[in-house]
Amino acid sequence: MIWRAGAIALVRRSKTVGQLRLLFVESWARGLGIGARLVSECVGQARHVGYRRMILFTVAGLDSARRLYEAEGFRLTEEKAGHAWGKDHLAQTWELEL
């Protein structure tokens, strides 16, 4: 059951833009394709409700997540230095045209 292994959210940003948020897969379930399935289902739902574009915000260094986003067709559109949770990081914006 996917809901016990991970989670993802699709948030409305505007009438035409949805935001992928909060992708999480339990450590014991990583590497089983669950993250890819969650991202794919989220993109499918965005298309179903009529969004024309999706965005997501993340930080550099989350390579497993980045590979999932790239495989689904997201492209990196912006990077900028930031500071959160007591650490410096490189904030990233990714976008997908639907």
Region locations from a protein language model:
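C-terminal "cap" of GNAT-fold acetyltransferases
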Residues: 52-98
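Active-site acidic-Proline motif in GNAT/NAT acetyltransferases
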Residues: 26-28, 32, 60-61
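Short coil/turn segments at alpha/beta junctions that flank glycine-rich nucleotide-binding fingerprints
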Residues: 16, 32, 48-52
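Conserved amphipathic alpha-helical interaction elements at protein-protein interfaces in regulatory
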Residues: 31, 44-48, 75
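Residues forming the Rossmann-fold NAD(P)(H) cofactor-binding site
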Residues: 32, 36, 40
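Acetyl-CoA-dependent GNAT
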Residues: 1-27, 39-41, 45, 78-82, ...
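Conserved GNAT acetyl-CoA-binding A-motif
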Residues: 39, 45-58
